[in-house]
A protein has these predicted regions:
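HIT superfamily nucleotide-processing domains
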Residues: 1-169
C-alpha cells in the first residue's frame, strides 16, 4: 500500500507496456486468431461477449462491437439498441451463474482513462461483499478463484440454454 491509502499493482504497468500481438487483440479474437485465447461466450452480427482474460472477479465480461470502434460515440443507433439489450441479457446470465451482490459497468476510452486496448469494450464486473482478502492486501495481487476458461465454459453453457433474443430484452 502506498501513501494516502492507495494500492499499487506494479504488474499492471508491465502488462500495459509489455509485448502485445500486432494489431487489435479484440479483432484477432473476433477473427478466431490462433494467437489469442478464445474466451467468447456469445456473438451475433453486431456484438461479442467474452470473459476477460485478466478478470477482476469471476464472471468479468467484455462486451464489444464486432466492427472496430474506439469511441462509444461511433456506435450506430442499431448498435446502441443491441448493446443495451445484450447488456441486460448478460447481466441476467451473470446473476444466475455467479450470484453477485452488485456490478461495476463501464468503458475505459483512451490510454489516459486506463484503456489498454483501443477497441471499444464495455466491462461488466460482478462484485461481492468482502471480496478483498488478506492475500490481496499483503501481496498486492488478486486471488482468482476460478480460471477464466472455466468461467467462459460455464457461461457458454448457460447462454446456450437461454439464448439472446431482442424480443426478451
Amino acid at each position: 500500500m502506498g501513501d494516502g491509502g492507495y494500492f499499487f499493482n506494479f504488474e499492471k504497468m508491465s502488462y500495459v507496456k509489455g509485448r502485445h500481438p500486432a494489431g487489435c487483440i479484440l479483432c484477432m479474437a473476433r477473427d478466431h486468431s490462433p494467437d489469442v485465447v478464445d474466451l467468447s461466450i456469445w456473438r451475433d452480427d453486431l456484438f461479442i461477449a467474452a470473459v476477460n482474460l485478466y478478470p477482476y472477479n469471476p464472471g468479468h465480461l467484455l462486451l464489444y462491437p464486432v466492427r472496430h470502434v474506439e469511441d462509444v460515440r461511433e456506435l450506430t443507433a442499431e448498435e446502441e439498441v443491441r448493446l443495451a439489450a445484450a447488456q441486460r441479457w448478460l447481466l441476467g446470465l451473470l446473476d444466475r451463474a455467479c450470484a453477485p451482490h452488485g456490478y461495476n459497468i463501464g468503458y475505459n476510452m483512451g490510454g489516459a482513462a486506463g484503456a489498454s486496448i483501443g477497441h471499444l469494450h464495455l466491462h461488466l464486473i460482478p462484485r461481492y461483499p468482502r471480496e478483498t482478502g488478506i492475500a490481496d492486501l499483503i501481496a498486492g495481487r488478486r486471488v482468482l478463484v476460478e480460471d477464466p476458461r472455466e468461467t467462459a465454459r460455464r457461461l457458454r453453457e448457460l447462454a446456450a440454454q437461454e439464448p439472446f433474443s431482442m424480443s426478451r430484452s
